Amino acid sequence: MARYLGPKCKLSRREGTDLFLKSGVKANDEKCKMNTAPGQHGARRARLSDYGLQLREKQKVRRMYGILEGQFKKYYVEASRRKGNTGATLLELLESRLDNVVYRMGFAATRAEARQLVVHKGIMVNGHTCNVPSAQVKVGDVVAVREKAKKQLRIQNAVELAKHRKELSWIDVNTDSLEGTMKSSPDRSELSADINEQLIIELYSK
């Protein structure tokens, strides 16, 4: 499956906001000109139409979670099938992905790093190794770093970085044993206020 392997800062500049694609060890410095889009004429951001705003919002969220278009569309279809607010359900599905939960628990510095950790069989769910990044974590599931992976320096660094992030009410993490439990469904109020999921729903509803 194709993945974007280019500069992470370029994607954040395109969307005009930090997509949290980098570890956070270093702040977005002057080299990452967040106020200007990438390219020769990046300083002049075009005025977007309603469709353009919807498309940019979809691209922003898709890139934030590191998901390709086809898979992202499937999440929308699944969210629209379920009862309740489609936008909130879409974000809940994205947040419940195993790679995202690993990132949220602080076992990886970025979602891309979490994805790699899962694919390389460094993560267990309920005592069983799971190497599927898109696997949906359910309430009550226990996610843990495998014993042989616990000594990896990148995991130790990620745990230290996570101490500076806001704690989430829907997960409970034990940093000593490197395991965590999903206590409840992801809470929209604790997710980025910079996401306007309604624009994504409007785009796909056309």
From Swiss-Prot:
- What biological-process GO terms show up in the record? ribosomal small subunit biogenesis; translation
Query: What are its GO cellular component terms?
Result: small ribosomal subunit
Q: Which Pfam families match?
A: Ribosomal_S4, S4
Q: Where is the S4 RNA-binding domain?
A: 96-158
Superkingdom of this protein's organism: Bacteria
Q: Name one GO molecular function term.
A: rRNA binding
Q: Which UniProt keywords apply?
A: Ribonucleoprotein, Ribosomal protein, RNA-binding, rRNA-binding
Q: How does it assemble?
A: Part of the 30S ribosomal subunit. Contacts protein S5. The interaction surface between S4 and S5 is involved in control of translational fidelity.
User: What's the stated role of this polypeptide?
Assistant: One of the primary rRNA binding proteins, it binds directly to 16S rRNA where it nucleates assembly of the body of the 30S subunit. With S5 and S12 plays an important role in translational accuracy.
Family that this chain belongs to = Belongs to the universal ribosomal protein uS4 family.
Cited HAMAP family: Ribosomal_uS4_B
Tell me what this protein is called. Small ribosomal subunit protein uS4
- Protein source organism: Francisella tularensis subsp. holarctica (strain OSU18)
* Gene name of this polypeptide: rpsD
